[in-house]
Each structure stands twice: as structure tokens, then as C-alpha cells.
A protein has these predicted regions:
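Glycine-rich phosphate-binding active-site loops on the catalytic face of alpha/beta enzymes
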Residues: 33-47, 124-137
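Conserved, mostly hydrophobic/aromatic
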Residues: 30, 72, 107, 115, ...
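C-terminal helical cap(s) of enzyme catalytic domains, especially alpha/beta-barrels
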Residues: 45-63, 133-148
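Conserved alpha/beta-domain cores
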Residues: 17-32
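Terminal leader/tail segments of proteins
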Residues: 116-117, 123-127, 134, 141-164
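Active-site beta-loop-alpha junctions enriched in small/polar residues
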Residues: 9-15, 42-46, 75
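Small-residue-enriched alpha-helical segments and adjacent helix-cap loops
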Residues: 64-106
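Single conserved hydrophobic/aromatic residue that forms the stacking wall/gate
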Residues: 1-8
Length: 164
């Protein structure tokens, strides 16, 4: 009896967004049915850019554990400059497959509630924000301290050193 591996890939590329959508739909459909052992995302660009999206597809399907960042889509209640905060947290977590769900939310009104399933997170407010762990507020901090406090808490929870 032979054991064969089935490689899931779409041998088409395109701009980043197009490639990610095509690959997510195509490969995700196969993997969700239990079809496939390895995956490849095809992007017109450096092959290194294919790794993170492939891991994310596997995480979304529950086939791989690791760091998951959730953030709000922003609305009129967003009181902080959210995108740089998301970028800083994402960069600090690069290369770490820590099984934590981390939230970076734009407002303290909805943030902690919408991210109640997160292990740890921050939610912005006017010049200050909240640090929360598993839905419970653990600190109210000045806005400029939020990301570092979040990264400190991640390091404490995971017992690792992040890329700062």
C-alpha cells in the first residue's frame, strides 16, 4: 500500500488581492472537505509573501494553531490611529506561532465586547484606552502606552520575547 500526498494549489497568479481571494476560495474549499496535505498560494511577487497567507488559510479552517490578530473595521467611534498599532503588533509577532488571539480595537465602547473571545487586547479611547484579558479590563492607559502594554502582556502570557 502506498501513501500519497495531495498538494493543493492554484497555478495562477495575479495582483496580491486577486491571488489571495482566488487561493482562499479554491484551496479553502478543498481543505474544508479534507482534501489535500500541502498548500501553495501563488502570488505575482516574491515567494516569501506566499507563506503568511497559506498559514492564515490553515488557521481559519482550524487546521493550524498560532497567533491570530483580530481588529475592528473602524467606524466613526474609532478614536485612535488604529492601522499603525495593528502594524506594530503584527511585526512584533512575526515568526511566532504563539496560540493566542490578540485584539486591536478602535473604541472602548464596542471593542472589549466584540473581542471578548480574544485572549488579550486593547481598545482605544480619546487619548487613552483599555487593556483587556479574556474580556476583563485590566488597565486603563494613555494611548501612547497601549501597544507596548499589549506586547508586554503577550510576552507574559506566552513566556516569549517578541520582535520589538
Amino acid at each position: 500500500i502506498y501513501t500519497l500526498s495531495l498538494h493543493d494549489a492554484l497555478p495562477i497568479s495575479g495582483p496580491l488581492a486577486t491571488s489571495l481571494i482566488r487561493s482562499s476560495v479554491g484551496i479553502g474549499a478543498l481543505l474544508s472537505e479534507g482534501i489535500g496535505d500541502t498548500v501553495r498560494i501563488s502570488i505575482s511577487g516574491p515567494p516569501e509573501e506566499e507563506i503568511a497567507p497559506a498559514k492564515e488559510i490553515l488557521r481559519c479552517l482550524g487546521l493550524r494553531k498560532g497567533f491570530e490578530l483580530i481588529s475592528c473595521p473602524t467606524c466613526a467611534r474609532t478614536k485612535i490611529d488604529l492601522l499603525p498599532m495593528i502594524d506594530k503588533v503584527t511585526k512584533a509577532m512575526e515568526g511566532h506561532d504563539i496560540p493566542l488571539r490578540v485584539a486591536v480595537m478602535g473604541c472602548a465602547v464596542n471593542g472589549p465586547g466584540e473581542a471578548r473571545d480574544a485572549d488579550v487586547g486593547i481598545a482605544g479611547g480619546v487619548k487613552e484606552g483599555l487593556l483587556f484579558r479574556r474580556g476583563e479590563i485590566i488597565a486603563k492607559l494613555p494611548q501612547e502606552e497601549l501597544v507596548d502594554a499589549l506586547l508586554d502582556e503577550i510576552e507574559r502570557m506566552a513566556n516569549v520575547t517578541l520582535n520589538r
